[in-house]
C-alpha cells in the first residue's frame, strides 16, 4: 500500500524523494441504431502488439530509485507499497529537509552517472524535483511548485502561431505560422512555481508550465502553440515507435531507422501505465503502418496509395440509400477502436541517429534517457514533425502546440537534472535573441564562434568557454558539459537575474470560522490538516508562517515567542482592510512552532458557539496579502460559504440564473464568468508581489466558483473542491491535498519565457499565470516557410527561486525536424497532446459561447483532421469506408467523451461546471484523457482474476453493456473515484468488501477499509496504485443502482446513447457522414 507522507516526513528532493501523499490517520445505448449512408469503418493500423507489451507502473513514490543497468536493464516485478493496513493511514514518516544544498561549479558532466532520482538537495542538482495545470515572453509566477500534476507553476500551454501572412484560424483549426520567433509574455507575474499543472501554448492547450502571480506550486504545464510555418531539416525517419513485446525488465524505446515504424499501443489512463491495465487489442486484424517516404519525396496531395498501407473493414448495417450491403448487418462494438493495453516499462531515448524520437503515450510507463532533447514530461508537441508551411498545417486540420511543464515529476529511475554554474558571467546566451546555450547550437571556426539555432545569428564564443572542435565538427568536451548534451539543464542565476534578494519561503493559512464551517466540521478538518503538515515545511531561518481566521470580521494572531500564548488581533473593517503589527503576524517557523500548534488546537473550540453566518472572504484574502506583501509566498485559504460581506462580496447568482436564464445560452455567458472585476484586480496585484493563492473549498452550498477561482488562476495557484463536504470522508483527502501542495518540489518568484526558431511565433498562451508584458523582444524578419530537412527548436526558460533561497534557471529545449509531407504529419501526431489542446480550448470557450456551439467546434476539429487524412493520405477510393490514421484512431472516442463531460452538460451545478473549467485550465497532458474518458475496473472478481503481475486489472469499456447487476465496479477520472454496487451482488462479496450482507446496509458516507481477506486487500491495493499514478488522493463515492448516485455513475458511460449525445457507434457514423459530405 502506498501511503501519503505523514507529518515529519521529508520533503521531495530531501533525503528521500517521494510522490504525492496517498493516505490519511445513463441509459443503455443501442449499438445497432445507426444512421444511414455508411458502409464500412476502416482503420489503418500497425501490426498488433505482442502480448504483455505495455508499460508497467514505476516503483511507488518514496522508494529508492533504480539505477539504469549497464546493459540489459531489468525493471523487476511491479513494486507494491507497504504492507496492508486495516484502513488507510498517514504515510510513512520521512525526515524534513535541513538547509539549502550546496551548489558547486560542475567541472564536467559524467556520462556514466547512474540514472537515479536525487535523494536530497544535491550539490549539483536543483533544489527541487523536476516534476502539476504557459509561456511566450517571460511569464511571472508568484510561486512554482513541482506538483503531481503535469505543468509548471500553474498549468498552462503556449500555442505557437503560423508564419506571417496566415489568416486567423477558427476554433479547432491549426494556428497559422507566424514569422519570427516569439517568446512567452514577458509580463507573467512571478511567484511560487510548482510542477502541478501544465501550460499550453498556441497550437494546443495542454497543462503546462505557468507563471503564477505569486508563489509557484507545481501546477500543470502550459502549452505553447508553435506557428505553422517552421523551417525544416533533413526529414526525420519514420515516426512511430516500434511495438514493445515480451516482458523485459526495461524495453529500450527507439524510433526505427527504416520504415515502417509501428505506433505506440494505446496507453492506460494512469499517469504511469499499469501492467495489464489497458484494453486488449481490437479483434480486427490490422496492417502495419506506412513507412516514411524518402527525404526528397514531394508532397503526395491526392496521389495514389502509399506503400504498405492497409485498412480493416468493419461492416455496418447502413449503406448508401438503395444500396445492398453484403455481409453482417451490424457494427461489432468489440471491433471499434478503444484504448489498448501495454504493460512493459520502456526506456525512451529522446534522440537517436541525430533526430528526435517520437515520445511514448503520456499515460504510459517510461523512463527517459535525455540524449539531447528534453523529456516529454517537460515539453511535448502536438505534432512531432513541424510542417514547413502554414498551408500544410492548415490542410492537416491539426493543432500545432507545445505542452510545457518544466517542473513535472520525473520517474524515480531517471537521471536528475544537472545544475551548471558559469560563475559571475552567467550562462552563455545568444547576444541577439537571448536564447540559452543548448545541444543544437553549432560551433564553427575552430570553436571560436557559434550559430544560434533560434535566430541564426553567428556569435562569438566567450574566451573562457572556448574548446577546439573534433574531426566530427563537435566540441571535444560536448559529453562533459550537460548544457551541450542534455535537453534539460539548470543554470545558477547571477545577480543580473535578481531584482531583489531571493524571497524567503512564506506559508500563510487563512481559515473560515463562520457558523457553517464550524457546524460542518470544515474548520476542524482544516486545522487538523495544517497541524499535521507543519513538520513537512522546510526547516531553517528562511521559513516563515502566518495564520488568520475570518467570518464577518478578520482575526490575525500574534505568534511571537515572547508571548505566553497567541494573541488575537481583530480587524472589523472589511471594506478598507489593513494588517495590524505586520512583523508579528508573519514570523519564522522556528520561533512560533509551539504557539502555532496550540492555536490550531484551540481554533475549533474558540468559535464553536459562533452564530455568525456571513463570510468576508475577499477582505480576508486582501488582508492576508497585505501581511505577506513585503516577502511574497503561498497563501492557502480554506473557505466554506459564499463571500457575502466586505471587499468582493458576492450574491447567489445560481438561483437567479436558474429562474431567469436559458441554461443553453445566457447561463454560459453570465454564471460561468466572474461577477465583476474586483477579485481579478486584486489577483493581479497579488501576482505582482509574488503571492500565490490556493483555495480549498469545503462547502455544502453554492460559493460562486466562477468568481473566486479567478484568484488562483491569475496567481498560479489551484482550486481544491470538496462538495458536498463530509466531516467523515473528506478530511483524509483534504490532508493529502494540502500535504502534496506543500511538500512537492516548488519554488518562488517564477518567470517563464518560450523561444522558437525563426519562422514560428507563439500565438497564444493558456494556463494559470499572469502576463505582464505581451512581448519583450524585437525579432528580426522571418520567413514564412521552413526548409524541408532542417530542424525547428523550442526552448522554455524558467527563472525561479528554490525553497532554499537559490536563484535558478531551468532551461528545456526541444528540436524537431521539419517536413513538407502531409502523411508525415499524421504519422507524427501526438494524440495525448492533440486532445489536451482541444480540451483546454473547449474549456476556454464555455463561459462565452452557447454549449451547442462549443460541442460543434470540438466535433468539427476532429472531423477536419480525419477528413484531411481521408482526402490526401488514404489509399482507399471507396467513400463507404471510414479511414482513421493509426495515431489518431481514438480521436473520435475522446471527442465524443468531451461533448458529454461535466463542463459541457446543462444539467449540473454551476459550481461543478466552473470547477471543471478551472481544473482543465491547468490540467497536465497525462490527466487530460482520463478526465473525460475515465478508467473503469471490475472489483467483484479481483481475487480470481489473473492480472499478470499487475495490481490493476484491465479496464472495461465505458458502456452499460459491460455492467452487471451482480457486479461491483470502480471508476476513476484522476480526481474522484466512484464505487458502483449492483442490486444483486452476492452477499459473500459484500461481506468481504464492506462487512455487510446486503447493498442496502452500506452507508452512503463510505470510507474505504481493508478487511482480512484477499478481495479486500486487492481492492485496497488497486485504489492505492491508482492514487499513486494520479498523484492524488481520490475521494471515493458510493453509487447504488436505482439512486441518484447510481445515475451519476451511469452518466460516465460515454459509449452509451444518452440525453447529452449519441452512442460511440452512432458518433462514428456521424463523423463518417460529415467526411463524405466534405468529400462530395
Swiss-Prot record:
Mainly expressed at low levels in pollen, leaves, roots and stems. The lineage of its organism: Eukaryota, Viridiplantae, Streptophyta, Embryophyta, Tracheophyta. One of its GO terms (biological process) is intracellular protein transport. One of its GO terms (cellular component) is COPII vesicle coat. One of its GO terms (molecular function) is zinc ion binding. It comes from the Eukaryota. It is found in: Cytoplasmic vesicle, COPII-coated vesicle membrane; Endoplasmic reticulum membrane; Golgi apparatus membrane. This is Protein transport protein SEC24 C. Its main location: membrane. Residues 12-43, 340-356 have a biased composition (Polar residues). Residues 71-84, 142-160, 178-189 have a biased composition (Low complexity). Disulfide bonds: none annotated. Gene3D superfamilies: beta-sandwich domain of Sec23/24 (2.60.40.1670), Sec23/Sec24 helical domain (1.20.120.730), Severin (3.40.20.10), von Willebrand factor, type A domain (3.40.50.410), Zn-finger domain of Sec23/24 (2.30.30.380). Keywords: Cytoplasmic vesicle, Endoplasmic reticulum, ER-Golgi transport, Golgi apparatus, Membrane, Metal-binding, Protein transport, Transport, Zinc. Belongs to the SEC23/SEC24 family. SEC24 subfamily. Residues 1-189, 201-220, 316-367 are annotated as: Disordered. Residues 430-455 are annotated as: Zinc finger-like. Component of the coat protein complex II (COPII), composed of at least five proteins: the Sec23/24 complex, the Sec13/31 complex and Sar1. CDD domains: Sec24-like. InterPro entries: ADF-H/Gelsolin-like_dom_sf (IPR029006), Gelsolin-like_dom (IPR007123), Gelsolin-like_dom_sf (IPR036180), Sec23/24_helical_dom (IPR006900), Sec23/24_helical_dom_sf (IPR036175), Sec23/24_trunk_dom (IPR006896), Sec23_24_beta_S (IPR012990), SEC23_SEC24_subfamily (IPR050550). Zn(2+) binds at residues 430, 433, 452, 455. The gene is SEC24C.
